[in-house]
Amino acid sequence: MKGVAYLKLIIAEKPSVAKSIASALGASSRADGFYEGSGLLVSWCVGHLVSPMDAGGYDERFKKWRYDDLPILPEPFRYVLAPGKEDAFENLCALMNRPDVDIIVNACDAGREGELIFRLVYEMAGCRKPVLRLWISSMEDSAIREGFSDLRPGADYEALYQSALCRQKADWLVGINATRLFSVLYHRTLNVGRVQTPTLAMLADRDAKITLFHKEKYHLLRLTLDGAEAVSEKFTDPAEAEQASAMCKGSAVTCTSVTKEQKKEQPPKLYDLTTLQREANRLFGYTAKQTLDYAQSLYEKKLLTYPRTDSRYLTSDMAETVSCVIHLTAKLPPFDSCTDFFPLVETMVSDKDVSDHHAIIPTMEIEKADIKGLPLGERNLFLLVCCKLLCASAEPYVYETVTATFDCCGHSFTAKGKRVISEGWREIDRIFRAFLKEKPADGDGDTLPDFTGGQTFDGAEVVVTEHFTQPPKPYTEDTLLSAMENAGKDGIPDEAERKGLGTPATRAVIIEKLVAAGFVERRGKSLIPTKAGINLVTVLPEPLTSPMLTAEWEQELTEIAKGSTDPDTFMDGIRTMVQEIVSTYSCISEDGKKLFAPEKKVIGTCPRCGQPVYEGKNNFACSDRSCGFVLWKNDRFWTSRKKELTKKMAADLLKKGRTNVKGMWSEKKQATYDAAVILNDTGGRYINFKLEFPKRKVGADGRK
């Protein structure tokens, strides 16, 4: 239109990000649902505004869960507005369709889910205006401005969008069909997920190994020489250990060899999200979700770079900026007590190992940030990332290992020691752990005396110690995240970009879903599968529990995002698998049905047949269905008196045939009263009750 000043509409994923973008780009005027200024409108989604339609939306009959309606395979998929987010969508829709807006800028999170969030809103709004993509790894003003000066065509991310769609559709197809199928078969809601179920299978497998573990006893001989300790090989027979000890005590000992080897331990890599979550769990006990939430908050506060990354390297164009960040970080307590060092930035740089986002590091904003004012969780995580940056840029840790072997009466003993030559990056790690009051990550070991080959010792001191083999340890979030990341590793080529269950951005959600569904429980730092979780893994088919298969799917999604795999081929494979599972599992055995039956507690004995009576959701019923004896909690007898039959009242009725009830309501008198309720079972379909009122005491005048 002639004379119209056209605007760019920038859409962020959440209000806080939109505010930062608006501030950085000069859109300083706040309106209802957007910021405006400098030729820009800046608005926001509130997470996912558009989501796949529920099964019931495709057909009324799908509102009920029935085996005969499976599988449900919608084509095409339809989408609806997320409940409660209609206003946010209408605001964006109105802005996108404004005649003075000529370009839409997708500024949602720079990743698979961020792409999906924007695209679904764009499609549902019916917008056809050109799209540009803001792709940044930091919320610093300088990074936002630099990213905005280098906007990319939205079409460049079409493959990423297709990958996101395939992920969403696959989760819907597997989740809806498998959950309904096994819930109907086992008469209990059993939530099945494309990624969460194989994760549960790993937990169940570890639990089984712990349960079946048989500990074995063994013994060691410990020889003391000049204050150092040398240890024998294992003895499985205690008699042999005692015999060897008796032979060695007081005997001569000869040093048969001394081996010294200088070793170098390179600095650790920077954090990606998974390694950050793992270490935060080890050091602070934070769950994966807590760590992600803290990291996201620090990102939005401009103190950390983008957290949902799977790279542990930086790009070459960042070298100068990172060097400045390192020097700023080194001034922060407790790192300001470290020995001066010159950062080796080149060790952290690898362009080929950075795809969407580089490793997580602090930003230049730390120079003016109030670190002490951060909430404790965020402060701990921020300092952890700072520590890793300093360690990664420091000198290697250099040490010498010493291994001395000894002979005593034909038995071999070994002593090991270590001597630090240059502490390097471990100095920073040690200082940080001392600040946290944590032990060093790896003890330096004892320094051995200067043993020499051929050296002899008289009067050996020997003791026998008893030990047991140890079972595998339960998974913690640290070790489970590692297992998820490496699942299927052996079956995927080394050059593959992603191996494992889920992505760094989704693994925390998967763990939380398993806990919320009652399939996993937290015991301290350990994640333990519940009985229901173990049973679920037992009854599900291999395609739904195989970490290898699911890891292969995740790899295919990565290939789709790169444009090297056809999305339709992937989805055809998912649909075929769902159809095969539904057709294979049409019924289960009677024993199978009992797997998920709630554990019932006997509250009494049936007065008709003598069998146990159990509490159900709405009643107390005889365990023999043919008997028919049932006490309903909301029988009209009770509801008319504004009461509900409780477990104690039912137990009294079964044991004594009566129960005393206070505060029953009389509609006629509009008042409450107390009475004994008598069980009056005539053997019919319904149980009857009678009331017995307490006898009144006779007064002095003869009246009651």
Predicted regions and their residues:
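C-terminal or mid-to-C-terminal helical accessory/interaction module adjacent to the motor/catalytic core
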Residues: 77, 99, 141-225, 260-264
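Conserved short loop/turn motifs at secondary-structure junctions
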Residues: 6-7, 105-110, 187-189, 260-269, ...
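Amphipathic alpha-helical transducer elements in NTP-driven molecular machines
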Residues: 15-22, 39-42, 46, 82-93, ...
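Basic, low-complexity terminal or inter-domain segments flanking catalytic cores
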Residues: 3-9, 31, 85, 96, ...
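Short strand-coil-strand connectors
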Residues: 36-38, 224-228, 407-411, 669
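Intrinsically disordered, low-complexity regulatory segments
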Residues: 1-168, 172, 343, 460, ...
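Metal- or metallocofactor-binding catalytic centers and their adjacent structured scaffolds
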Residues: 239-271, 277
